[in-house]
């Protein structure tokens, strides 16, 4: 266990991304994916936030309804007509009313507003298996225009193999050798 807490780990990753790549990232931490997504949007830029189920009423419910994940413009307009203005208003609305006006999407929004999400974050990592591809070119490439089609073809090949195996990439790396 490399980190003493999830927040410490997230801060280290966030700082390393900035150091290596020069851009900022926000990190949301939770036991549920929708809450991690919501937490990552709390305050920007370059922040780490938690949003665990027990924190939902304090941290998420006061937010405007339009900030809820998957609440699009049309859904928000419908909810405002129902006098639902905050995520807390939505969380405390009878889901049957939401289904009447927004169909199954209303139920899903109600679940999200209450921090309910059946796609929990997996804490046990599966054994990493690499999927890669490489090529040796007959001559050195010197421009981005020459290199980009080669990289796209290699990436497409790896993507096909990942999809066929039912896997997703956890890391992408590119190695370039030249003489």
Describe every region a protein language model picked out:
Residues 75, 80-179:
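DNA-contacting surface of Y-family translesion DNA polymerases
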Residues 1-101, 105-108, 160:
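Gly/Gly-Pro- and Ser/Thr-rich, intrinsically disordered tail segments characteristic of DNA damage-repair
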């Amino acid at each position: 266990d490399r980190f003493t807490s999830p927040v410490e780990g997230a801060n280290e990753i966030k700082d390393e991304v900035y150091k290596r790549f020069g851009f900022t990232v926000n990190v949301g931490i939770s036991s549920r994916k929708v809450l991690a997504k919501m937490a990552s949007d709390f305050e920007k830029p370059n922040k780490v936030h938690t949003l665990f189920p027990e924190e939902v009423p304090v941290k998420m419910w006061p937010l405007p309804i339009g900030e809820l994940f998957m609440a699009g413009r049309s859904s928000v307009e419908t909810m405002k007509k129902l006098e639902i203005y905050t995520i807390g208003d939505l969380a405390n609305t009878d889901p049957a009313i939401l289904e009447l006006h927004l169909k199954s999407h209303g139920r899903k929004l109600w679940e999200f507003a209450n921090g309910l999400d059946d796609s929990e974050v997996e804490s046990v990592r599966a054994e990493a298996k690499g999927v890669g591809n490489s090529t040796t070119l007959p001559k050195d490439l010197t421009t981005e225009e020459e290199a980009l089609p080669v990289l796209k073809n290699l990436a497409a090949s790896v993507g096909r193999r990942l999809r066929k195996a039912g896997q997703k990439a956890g890391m992408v790396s590119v190695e370039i050798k030249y003489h």
